[in-house]
């Protein structure tokens, strides 16, 4: 050891282990406008004080480790460390706390959701001193927001490209999700678009399997789009899933979609990765393609109430990393989603400025400045009887995406989209006339059945179908 090293090591350094809270719990800290703020739901192990648990989260997700290290003296911990600045108990839950942590902006690479997540939701989630840990929300400062380009186009450009205004957009996921040949798949796309839908969609499972290679699917779907557009006079689209085993292959598929002059491609955001999403978003922005985002695998991360990460965090990250649409649950369908919680993250996707509202799970005021908005997609176990509720809950700036609720029509593929379009038009007209969809929804659908046999047949098939289970994702 050199004399210089000996001198530095001997001044102010004491080896050993000390409580995290001595360094990382700072209840008097005043947060800065440039800090990234996090709200964690912390469940400490028995005997671990909540302040120590919150400080451990702040430490292990920023500059700290389990013991003091000599190299702490070579930097400024006060400048770079995360700080647990508040602890509050979770009402109605034993031994659960909300720990508020502030992170200096210099800890994060500009324009990188991957780097942000690597720090904030990294190894700390396996920390033994915690029984469980869940990231409930993040406040992204405007200084960091401005380092991202966000969605390739956003809501207004989406509508302008389609030339469709004043109502939700209407879509359908092609079923069965696996097993169709490319030609039969294209036929289903054509029948749906011809019947009145704005979009059809590849299921997230569809990539390039032996029964249907991606290039064949792209060609037959493009043919279906052109034919439906010519016959209806409306602009149509199909979400061509560009997700692949490598980013290079993904980009090759996106390039081929652009060469076919289709309006939109699709990517599996979580299974494909944030980096791939951002790369594809940049390409879509430069080449005039809309980007639809699927959230497959999200429930592995966000379903459990005490561990993981809430979907509102994933939604914020997607808006930063880039996507024009993202699936957001339905409230009324087969997938998990409580109304107020869902509307909270829907606002985080669409609006420019969202105020703190704990009743909807929004822990921090969020200012997106000029970052474009994202269209929420309601999809999963919905049918024509749900149309009034979906229109009332999600409003015009949304995509209502039916799968079995279109292709399960008793008369076949073609009448299904007709029934959905009639139901949507009836609900929008009734709403515009001042009728309350929450009160008169079923009556509005029954009235429309009188002049649409396709809708009447659909209503008869699905009149008893409900998905009524208690939501796990409720705010306490």
Curated annotation (Swiss-Prot):
N-acetylproline: residues bearing it: 3
Q: Which residues form the propeptide?
A: 1-2
- Residues the record annotates as the site (Transition state stabilizer) are 334
Record: active site: 175 (proton acceptor)
Q: Provide GO CC annotations from the record.
A: chloroplast
Query: What keywords are assigned to this protein?
Result: Acetylation, Calvin cycle, Carbon dioxide fixation, Chloroplast, Disulfide bond, Lyase, Magnesium, Metal-binding, Methylation, Monooxygenase, Oxidoreductase, Photorespiration, Photosynthesis, Plastid
State where the protein is found.
Plastid, Chloroplast
Regarding how it is modified after translation, the entry says: The disulfide bond which can form in the large chain dimeric partners within the hexadecamer appears to be associated with oxidative stress and protein turnover.
Q: Which GO terms describe its biological process?
A: photorespiration; reductive pentose-phosphate cycle
EC supergroup of this enzyme: lyase
> Could you tell me the EC number(s) of this protein?
4.1.1.39
Annotated Mg(2+) binding sites: 201, 203-204
What does this protein's record comment on cofactor binding?
Binds 1 Mg(2+) ion per subunit.
Q: Which InterPro entries match?
A: RuBisCO, RuBisCo_large_chain_AS, RuBisCO_lsu_C, RuBisCO_lsu_C_sf, RuBisCO_lsu_fd_N, RuBisCO_lsu_N_sf, RuBisCO_lsuI
Reported cofactor(s) = Mg(2+)
What's this protein's function? RuBisCO catalyzes two reactions: the carboxylation of D-ribulose 1,5-bisphosphate, the primary event in carbon dioxide fixation, as well as the oxidative fragmentation of the pentose substrate in the photorespiration process. Both reactions occur simultaneously and in competition at the same active site.
Q: What assembly does the database describe for this protein?
A: Heterohexadecamer of 8 large chains and 8 small chains; disulfide-linked. The disulfide link is formed within the large subunit homodimers.
Q: Which family does it belong to?
A: Belongs to the RuBisCO large chain family. Type I subfamily.
How is this protein named in the record? Ribulose bisphosphate carboxylase large chain
Q: Supply the source organism for this entry.
A: Barnadesia caryophylla (Xenophontia caryophylla)
Gene coding for it: rbcL
């Amino acid at each position: 050891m050199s004399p210089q090293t000996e001198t530095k090591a001997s001044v102010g350094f004491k080896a050993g282990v000390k409580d995290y809270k001595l360094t990382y719990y700072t209840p008097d800290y005043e947060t800065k406008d440039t800090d990234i703020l996090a709200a964690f739901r912390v469940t400490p192990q028995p005997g671990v004080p909540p302040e120590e648990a919150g400080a451990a989260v702040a430490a292990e997700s920023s500059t700290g480790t389990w013991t003091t290290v000599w190299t702490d003296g070579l930097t400024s911990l006060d400048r770079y460390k995360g700080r647990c600045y508040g602890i509050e108990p979770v009402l109605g839950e034993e031994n659960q706390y909300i720990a508020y942590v502030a992170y200096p902006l210099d800890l994060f690479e500009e324009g990188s959701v991957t780097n942000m997540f690597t720090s904030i939701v990294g190894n700390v989630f396996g920390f033994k001193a915690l029984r469980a840990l869940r990231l409930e929300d993040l406040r992204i400062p405007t200084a960091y927001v401005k380092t991202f380009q966000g969605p390739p186009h956003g809501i207004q450009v989406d509508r302008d490209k389609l030339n469709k205004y004043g109502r939700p957009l209407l879509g359908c996921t092609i079923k069965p999700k696996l097993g169709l040949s490319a030609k039969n798949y294209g036929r289903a796309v054509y029948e749906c678009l011809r019947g009145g839908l704005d979009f059809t969609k590849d299921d997230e499972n569809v990539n390039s399997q032996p029964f249907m290679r991606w290039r064949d699917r792209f060609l037959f779907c493009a043919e279906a789009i052109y034919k439906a557009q010519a016959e209806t006079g409306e602009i149509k689209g199909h979400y061509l899933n560009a997700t692949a085993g490598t980013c290079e292959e993904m980009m090759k598929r996106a390039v081929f979609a652009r060469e076919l002059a289709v309006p939109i491609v699709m990517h599996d955001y979580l299974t494909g990765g944030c980096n791939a999403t951002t790369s594809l978003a940049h390409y879509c922005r430069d080449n005039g393609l809309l980007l639809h985002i699927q959230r497959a695998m999200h429930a592995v991360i966000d379903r459990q109430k005490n561990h993981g990460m809430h979907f509102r965090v994933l939604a914020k990250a997607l808006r930063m990393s880039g996507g024009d649409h993202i699936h957001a649950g339905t409230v009324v369908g087969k997938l998990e989603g409580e109304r107020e919680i869902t509307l909270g993250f829907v606002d985080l996707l669409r609006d420019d400025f969202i105020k703190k509202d704990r009743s909807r799970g929004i822990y921090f005021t969020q200012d997106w400045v000029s970052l474009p908005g994202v269209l929420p997609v309601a999809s999963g176990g919905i049918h024509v009887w749900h149309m009034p509720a979906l229109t009332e809950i999600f409003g015009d700036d949304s995509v209502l995406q039916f799968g079995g609720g279109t292709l399960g029509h008793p008369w076949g593929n073609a009448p299904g989209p007709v029934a959905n379009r009639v139901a949507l038009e009836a609900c929008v007209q009734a709403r515009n006339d001042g009728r309350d969809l929450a009160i008169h929804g079923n009556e509005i659908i029954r009235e429309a059945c009188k002049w649409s046999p396709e809708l009447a047949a659909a209503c008869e098939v699905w009149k008893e179908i409900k998905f009524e289970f208690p939501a796990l994702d409720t705010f306490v």
